[in-house]
Amino acid sequence: NIYSLSLLDKVTDSKGNLIEDYTPELKATMDIPNNEWDIIHAGMREVVENNDAFQDFDYPVSGKTGTAQEVTTRPSHGLFIGFAPSDNPEIAMAVRIANGYSSTNAAAVAKDVISYKYNLVDKDAIVTGTASAGGSTQQTD
């Protein structure tokens, strides 16, 4: 199914009362056989399993990395799109770091978002910047 873009699900007040609902509108449908989706999902799972940013990360995440070069005088843009958990997705994300050198850096941000969402690490560690492995996966060239 293809839906209209919506960055928000809903807006509520501090008591949980609905202020505005952003239920996405169905725009079109696509018929893609399940076995083809299975191949795509398996590939996206392998991307994450073989990405340095997700080493020793036991939560099932699927995604795709990418870099986009603008000019040779500036670092490439780092990109990561993904969803979690892999087998029953609850969240989807897209991370773009302008001039971020590498997709691994964008994937590391996604890992921190997932860690925060699913309480996989102390939230104070994310806020203070100590949640990742000391920057060992950060790439600068």
Feature-to-residue mapping (PLM):
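Active-site beta-strand/loop architecture of penicillin-binding DD-peptidases
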Residues: N1-T29, N35, H41-D124
